[in-house]
Structure formats: C-alpha cells, structure tokens
Design a protein with these regions (language model features):
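Flexible helix-coil transition and linker loops at the boundaries of alpha-helical arrays
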Residues: 19-28, 59-78, 92, 108-120, ...
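"A position-specific structural signal for the A-helix of alpha-solenoid helical repeats
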Residues: 7, 36, 77, 84, ...
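Terminal, low-structured helical/coil segments at or just beyond the last alpha-helical repeat
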Residues: 201-243
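Structural motif corresponding to the intra-repeat A-B loop/turn of tetratricopeptide repeats
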Residues: 15, 44, 92-93, 136, ...
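TPR/TPR-like (Sel1-like) alpha-helical repeat modules
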Residues: 58-59, 107-108, 181-198, 227
C-alpha cells in the first residue's frame, strides 16, 4: 500500500472512538504498527481497509524468542493477524479452505511459542477451526477433531485451553442435538481446565446446582463468557529502583 493509503488508515485509528496515539502506530516500516492498525480497523468494522493492511503481514516471520515485559510479542502479533484475516476471509468470501489455512497457521504458531501468551487463548484458534467446520456442515469431522485433541492432551491436566475448547465444542454439539444432560456434563468437564477465580468458583457452583439440565447448560454458557483469570501466568514485572 502507498503512503497516502497508510496515513489514511493511521488517521482513522488515531481519531476513532477509542483512539490509539499516532506515535505508537504510524511507522509503516515496523510491521507491528501495521498489525495494530489492521486489527484496530477490523475491530472498527472497517473490514476492507483492515484486510488491505493485514495482508502486508502475511510474509512476516516473527521472532519466536521475543517476549517483552509489556505489550504483545511478535508471535502474538502474527497469530492475531492470522486469526483476523481468517475471520475476514470467512465472513466476506465464505472461503472455507483459505480461512482454515490461516487458522491452522495461527494455531501452529501459537502452539510453537514457548513464552506466555498475553492476548488470547491459544486454544481459541483450534475452536474457531471447529466452528467453521460446523458452519459448512462438517460437524462430524469437527467432533472427531475435538475428540482427537482430547486424546493428544491426555495427562496435560490443570489449565489447558486445548482440552477446554474441545470439551466446550462437544458440549455445544450435544446441546444442538437436544441432549442438554450430556451437554451440561461436558461443559462441567471443560471448566476443569479453565482459569477460574473465587468468583468463578461461585458461578460454577451455581451452575452445577441449577435444577434442570437446560438451566445448567445455560449457566455454563454464561460462565464461558467471563475471563475470570488470565489463561497464562505472566512473569513478575522487573521494576528498576536505581534510576
């Protein structure tokens, strides 16, 4: 994209309802600026402009050892860009193969990154793949992939986004088939791998105590909309006091 197009995008993001300071996003030669602008445009529903910017990042190879104390790592920038490109391709063109390809790249990259992820759940990339398969009528394939993920993650107990999202998808599958009893059981199992605070424990207790299976499932769905705690613990900030 040319300088005029880039500056128009920067101006739109910097002057939006939730403005981002120009100094943080104006350098086109820093691909992380393009990442921020492109994703902000998508959030602002400027889909075509977002795709125009995000497409410039497809060939970028992120530094997999980059792990800043503040802000997103290069790996996270790339993963989030791929995620949003997949969403755009799916929503605008209904191109299943392209959308799944971008999500698979995002999944592989997030899985390979060895440092904490601040911005999203790594398992969300896998879940989005399953959701697209469901939308195109390949729900049985998605179910098989979710079950295979559970097999792959056997023994990885504790907080585990891959197991959580696999169980969540299977719970939704059973709900769609009219079996809320099984759906609620699967959702309860999913939350064994979800980061939960004391407030979350109370909410889950209420969900488990709901009178009917349908009410239990509905309550678990509500709990799934709340991020009670970060998915991954971050290292403590290093604060210099000798300046």
């Amino acid at each position: 994209m040319n300088e005029q197009e880039w500056q128009a995008c920067v101006n739109h993001v910097a002057g939006g309802e939730y403005p981002v300071p120009r100094g943080m996003i104006s350098n086109y030669n820093d691909w992380r600026c393009r990442s921020t602008v492109g994703r902000a445009l998508y959030w602002m529903d400027e889909v075509e402009a977002a795709m125009h910017v995000l497409a410039t990042i497809l060939d970028v190879e992120p530094d997999m050892e980059d792990a800043p104390e503040m802000g997103l790592s290069e790996a996270e920038h790339k993963v989030l860009c791929l995620r949003d490109i997949a969403e755009i391709v799916w929503k605008l063109a209904r191109n299943e193969d392209a959308a799944l390809n971008y999500l698979d790249q995002a999944y592989a990259l997030s899985r390979a990154y060895k440092h904490p992820f601040r911005s999203a759940s790594r398992g969300d990339m896998f879940y989005r793949r399953l959701a697209i398969l469901r939308e195109v009528g390949k729900e049985e394939q998605a179910v098989q992939e979710a079950e295979k993920m559970l097999e792959l993650e056997v023994g990885n107990d504790g907080i585990n986004p891959y197991r959580y999202f696999a169980y969540k998808f299977l719970a939704e599958h059973e709900h769609n088939n009219g079996d809320d009893e099984k759906a609620a059981q699967l959702f309860a199992e999913a939350f064994r791998y979800y980061p939960v605070s004391e407030a979350g424990e109370r909410d889950l207790g209420k969900a488990a105590a709901a009178e009917t299976a349908a009410d239990r499932y509905k309550a678990y769905v509500f709990c799934s909309t709340i991020q009670y705690k970060p998915w991954e613990e971050l290292p403590p900030a290093i604060i210099r006091r000798d300046l």
